[in-house]
Structures are given as structure tokens and as C-alpha cells.
UniProtKB/Swiss-Prot annotation:
CDD domains: QueC-like (cd01995). This is 7-cyano-7-deazaguanine synthase. It catalyses: 7-carboxy-7-deazaguanine + NH4(+) + ATP = 7-cyano-7-deazaguanine + ADP + phosphate + H2O + H(+). Catalyzes the ATP-dependent conversion of 7-carboxy-7-deazaguanine (CDG) to 7-cyano-7-deazaguanine (preQ(0)). Its EC number is 6.3.4.20. Pathway: Purine metabolism; 7-cyano-7-deazaguanine biosynthesis. It comes from Acetivibrio thermocellus (strain ATCC 27405 / DSM 1237 / JCM 9322 / NBRC 103400 / NCIMB 10682 / NRRL B-4536 / VPI 7372). Belongs to the QueC family. Binds 1 zinc ion per subunit. InterPro entries: QueC, Rossmann-like_a/b/a_fold. Its cofactor is Zn(2+). Keywords: ATP-binding, Ligase, Metal-binding, Nucleotide-binding, Queuosine biosynthesis, Zinc. Zn(2+) binds at residues 186, 194, 197, 200. Gene3D superfamilies: HUPs (3.40.50.620).
Length: 222
């Protein structure tokens, strides 16, 4: 059976991505990171998603507090959604570079041919490491800088959600019976989702456009 490493944050997109890998017949190796994120519920959600799909392997890597972001520094406020065309304070420095680098090494160790990552360039917060050109550049680095790449069988980065709207992602998740009720999206990380940060607003908008009810609890529904 083909093997794939799946980057799993515990959020809607990564959980959908995991469901796609399973639907495509991969033996999946979920990979999560503890990087000092404000929303500590993310990792618990990731564990619940893994349990829901009855997966045996789930690697959680503790890399310490990356810092420099509202998602990792309690002294930086998470802003309400504004939809501005700028890189927001919730950007975590080089996050996907770090995650993908580790994922490539892990993929070579477990002999996986692919890495699934739920980056999206449509309904997203403007992070530079979610763009198609970043993924293309990183794929070139894999091709040139790994044993599998030099041997002509590089680990392939697969981004099934990159050109989908949030509504399309939600519909895909439902088709694959992904447990969206277990996912955590809010940047603020409270007991209930705030409903007004970038991530919450995009999620609520997606569910509304998909015509599907979002069953997680919110402080406020926009």
C-alpha cells in the first residue's frame, strides 16, 4: 500500500486533507507539531481526529515556541477579521517551511511517497507559505536535497485543497465523512470559538455558502 505523511493541525483544512489521503487509498502517517500555539485545543482535536479514523500512528513533534506571532505570543492580540491584503500578525515565521522540512525527513524514514498538506490560496489569511509558488519551490528543494529525490523518486507534496473555496473544502470533507465537529479553528483558543477572528469568519462563511450547519460552539456567529 502507498504511504503518505499527512500534516494534521486539528483544524478543518488539515482534517479534510487527511480524509482525502485516506479516500485515495494511502496508508497515512499523521504528523502534528507543538510549536507553542495559543490554541492548545488544536493538538487535542488532532488526537481525536486520529482516533475517529482509527489510525495507529500519530507523531507529535514538540519544537518549542516559535514566537513572533499572535498565534504563539500571548502579548500580541489576535485581531478581528478585516480582510486586508496584507500578511497578518497571525503569520507564524516560516511555519510551513519548518513543518514540511520535518515531514520530508519523516517520509523518507517511513518510506512514504507523498506528503499531504492542507494549504489553501483562495479563502485564506494571506500567508506567503500557503501559495502555490511556495509549494513548487519546496518541491524543487526536495528533488535536489534528498536521497529519494536524487534517486529519481522524490517525495511528492500533494495539496488537494489549494484551489478550493472554503465551501468546497467543507463539502469535500462531508463527502469523505470527515469529523468536522471535532476540529478546532479559532485563533484565540478559548473554550468556545470566538467567531470573529480570520479563521472563524472564513469557516462560518464556508459553512453558510455550503449550506451545511457548523455544529461547533461559537461565542458569536457573524
Amino acid at each position: 500500500m502507498r504511504r503518505a505523511v499527512v500534516l494534521l493541525s486539528g483544524g478543518l483544512d488539515s482534517t479534510t486533507c487527511l480524509s482525502v489521503a485516506l479516500a485515495e487509498g494511502y496508508e497515512v502517517y499523521p504528523l502534528s507539531f507543538d510549536y507553542g500555539q495559543r490554541n492548545r485545543k488544536e493538538l487535542e482535536s488532532a488526537k481525536q481526529v486520529v482516533k475517529y479514523f482509527k489510525l495507529k500512528e500519530h507523531k507529535i513533534v514538540k519544537i518549542g515556541n516559535v514566537g513572533g506571532s499572535a498565534l504563539t505570543d500571548m502579548n500580541i492580540d489576535v485581531p478581528d477579521y478585516k480582510g486586508l491584503p496584507t500578511i497578518p500578525v497571525t503569520y507564524v515565521p516560516a511555519r510551513n517551511i519548518i513543518f514540511l522540512s520535518y515531514a520530508v525527513g519523516y517520509a523518507e524514514v517511513v518510506d512514504a511517497e507523498a506528503i499531504f498538506i492542507g494549504v489553501n490560496a483562495v479563502d485564506y489569511s494571506g500567508y506567503p507559505d500557503c501559495r502555490p509558488e511556495f509549494i513548487e519551490a519546496f518541491q524543487k528543494a526536495i528533488n535536489l536535497g534528498t536521497k529519494s529525490g536524487v534517486n529519481g523518486k522524490p517525495v511528492k507534496i500533494i495539496t488537494p485543497l489549494i484551489n478550493l473555496s472554503k465551501a468546497e473544502i467543507i463539502k469535500l470533507a462531508c463527502e469523505n465523512n470527515a469529523p468536522l465537529h471535532l476540529t478546532t479553528t479559532c485563533y484565540r483558543g478559548g473554550e468556545k470559538a470566538c467567531g470573529v477572528c480570520d479563521s472563524c469568519v472564513l469557516r462560518l462563511k464556508g459553512f453558510k455558502e455550503a449550506g451545511i450547519v457548523d455544529t461547533i460552539e461559537y461565542m458569536e456567529r457573524t
